[in-house]
Amino acid sequence: MISLNNSFFNKRVIVNSFNNYKRSFGTKSQNEESAIVDSNHSFAHTLNLPKTTFSMKANAATREPTLLKDPYKLYKWQLENNKGENWVFHDGPPYANGDLHMGHALNKILKDIVNRYKVLKGFKVNYIPGWDCHGLPIEQQAFKKLKKSSDMKASDIRKIAGDFARKEIEKQSKGFQEMGILGDWENPYKTLDYGYEVEQIQTFYDMFNKGYIYRGVKPVHWSPSSRTALADAELEYNNNHTSKSIFVKFNVKSLSNHILNNLPTTSDINKAEMVISAIIWTTTPWTIPANQAICVNSEMDYILVKPIESEQYRNEMFIISKERLESLTKSFNIGELKVILEFKGEQLKGTITKHPQYDRESPIITGDHVIEGSGTGLVHTAPGHGVEDFQICQQQYPDLKVLSPVNDLGCFTDEVGEKFVGLEVLGDGNEAVINDLETIGSLLHKEDYIHKYPYDWRTKKPIIIRTTLQWFVGLKNIQKTALQSIERVNMVPPSGSNRLSSMIGKRTDWCISRQRVWGCPIPVLYNCKTNEPLINDESINHIKELFGKFGSDCWFEMSTQQLLPPSLKDQHENFVKGTDTMDVWFDSGTSWRGVLVERGIIDKDTGRADIYLEGSDQHRGWFQSSLLTSVCVRDIEPYKNVVTHGFLLDESGIKMSKSIGNTIVPSTVIKGGPNKVQNPPYGVDLLRTWVASSDYSKDISIGPNILIKILDGIKKIRNTLRFMLASNFDFDPTIHAIPYEKLSSLDKYALHRVFKLQESVTRHYDQFQFQKVHTEIINFSIEISSFYFDVIKRHLYAESPNSHSRRSTQTVLFKMLDVINIALAPITVHTSEDVFLHQYQFKNNGKGLDKNLIENSVFAHGWDQLPSQYENELISNQFTNIIAIRDVVNRVLQSMRSQGIIGRSDETIMELTVTNEESSPFYDNLFAINSQLDDIFCVSNVLLKKFNTFEKDVEQQQQQQQQQQQQQPQQIEPNSKGEFIFNTIISNNSKQLGRIEVLLKISDKFKCPRCWRHTSIENDKVCKPCDSVLNSLK
């Protein structure tokens, strides 16, 4: 039984369409070795042989540059000529450092696909490419050029860094334009632009005025390798970092009353001689000198234990978590630990311990952040080097002077004493602390500990927590508004919403000050006596005016007197300018204002970009910083849609890395490598097709084998396009087009399929589902080629040039080509431009279009919406059934070919016997197109019959045939008359439509020497239809 649905083919037909794909383009095969495309045929001059200069091969490396419309000129043209609404695509700025890599290509091509689609739909696309210009990597380039670090002036570093960034921008810009990226390349934005920095410091001041920005002493992520504070977004985590973990004894100086009063007196416990210690565990031994407390959980159970098998510790007892007893007994490896006393953490309050290395106390305090499962249950607390440590100490000891004895270089200061001063805390200093603890008898145990640890994302080196005076954005008061705003944003994929919300919900402060030279300065001067910041309307307006004229370099080049507002210039000796610069995420995070508002693209109070599209790492980067600054200033999110893509993997699923050597650069894919055999030049369209065909919501693989597969897909589509162009070589739609109502049922069916293609492709583009767009077009090309193209060849080639049926088919092909090419255009930019020029060759009296004119671009043509009348479900259902029958016929013909009975299908004639199920118009639908059945089934003649019953039990025969088909390829044997007969049932959506019997036999007529159909009455004579055409040509 053949079961159908409303798709173009059932599954078997789709599979067959792949096998028969080449046949639809005139490629020689057993069934299609047709003289119709043989120019040496004696009747060739009477045939409408296909012709086109559209090459089978793309020759992309050489031809694409000649086809590409200038991305900037096209961008300007659409802004001036498109009549639709504004579409604001805000570009997340890549770093102005280094050559373009495949991540750049993935990101920019995805953006360009969106923008070019919107241009075709008539929108005015606003897309201003941008670059992130500040930060350490560019500053390091300046260091390399300045020979002596002692001679480095801030102004010298900044000049070299700025020049370097501008050169990198110029290089990257050229590469992006070669990829066909549409945009305002003459006026990109740069975070070092004067106007941009003016808007940035205004945003800083607005947030300060609203109370969101403040200055304070807090623990921050500090990078000794970069010598600056870092934000969360500037960290990456090493899951296999190895730390030295230690268990340290803090001797109890005085116990809490509860424990003291309940301490038992036994023969093995001498209170006078017994030493009680609180045992802490840490993976950062270098922070022990900064310890100022020990934290426990008031609700957890703790125990006092005594080693009873260790001579070394016979006069000692340890305080540890009850839950950790078994694990710690193994770790300490000093024998059994006897439980002496059990108590709650709350009962430890009031206990005072002595710092093992310094003459100071460390009280035991309580905190909810202490949990079971690791360590000892007693947490070493160094408020100068831990966020939670700092918070708990601030709550319980507001006046505590926090110790943070580490300098900008990550070395101990003299606060720790002579034995450690100057040592690197992540190196020799760490070892020195451990050795010292061991020497004084306070080290109970040490071991390596592998865990997740934060690294500087730029230098790839570990960071530390360090308490310093910094500028922060306090997030507690805006978290609710920020989280509510995320709910209004369309996230693609939807999981991005939870991810962004989770990150913002867990964040309390954002450190925005950096101790670097190359960046936008924090526009604040400080009172020399009070250290109070000078920041008010007058000071900010004055600095804005200076930045607007001279750029932020003036902050480092001008005197304090020049930087002070007029009213305070006489007091310049009382002020000093700050040396901090802003976090690069604050730089780029204010781009909604520095670009979109400043250039008048969106309203300053309520305007939002239509879309932000970046890698998934930007949930903790640009997406977040943009949201926070916009919500702080305007109480509104800066974007309507946020689309994220994954990262790049090689063909083995391994992340691409220069150190591994598995990277591929865009230029190699486009232009080829030194060895063109090993790395051939594929061109830009292939790179863009790779992007479009990938599920960008996940990590994406690329490699030689993947590129070859992409190339095969491009060839299929290109052949489809070429067939339509070649078939319409003499078609001018302004003269030859046939009205819809006069088209054949077959042509109407083809238009219905084109309509549905356009409908689905439009939907997928609107939802940013480019992989589905690509799949739809590929499948349509294969499906339409294996059926419609197969059926229409006789009309195209053998009928008279101006016959109704030929012009009807060409009308459909023109519309079909238009829709497919326009649907492809956002992806295969160059190919679509080429097709467009060939399709409209009839323009200007056959001279075609001037390819040098922007208005002759396919993107100026627009996304023509097909008329709704093209959607014809009635005809679609009819042809769905017919195609299923054709599948049956093809299987019978294949049996005849495999047995050597025929070479071509049109050597046969066919009898198609049909029975109708009750209330089914199955036979009537076939009868309505009776005249087209021989073309549809590719045979010389079809005789349609109608009967009520068959002689055989069809259902029983169908079951036998299905069983045979499961075991081996179906082979149909002829009967005694040489006839091939096959019976089956046709059904649609489980509804039985009718039964058919297909009878195929050799035609008793002769082969027509012109069309090769076996319909001639006499040998070597043309058939009647061909004779009529020949007479019309005289």
Curated annotation (Swiss-Prot):
Reaction equation(s) it catalyzes: tRNA(Ile) + L-isoleucine + ATP = L-isoleucyl-tRNA(Ile) + AMP + diphosphate
Listed GO MF terms: aminoacyl-tRNA deacylase activity; ATP binding; isoleucine-tRNA ligase activity; tRNA binding
EC class: ligase
Transit peptide as recorded in UniProt: 1-32
Residues the entry annotates as binding ATP: K658
Any GO BP annotation: mitochondrial translation
A matching Pfam family: Anticodon_1
EC number of the protein: 6.1.1.5
Segments crossing the lipid bilayer: none
Entry keyword annotation includes Lipoprotein: no
Gene3D superfamilies registered for this protein in UniProt: 1.10.730.20, HUPs (3.40.50.620), Ile-tRNA synthetase CP2 domain-like (1.10.10.830), Valyl/Leucyl/Isoleucyl-tRNA synthetase, editing domain (3.90.740.10)
GO cellular component terms, A-Z: mitochondrial matrix; mitochondrion
PANTHER family, per database record: ISOLEUCINE--TRNA LIGASE, MITOCHONDRIAL, SOLEUCYL-TRNA SYNTHETASE
Protein name, per record: Probable isoleucine--tRNA ligase, mitochondrial
Organism: Dictyostelium discoideum
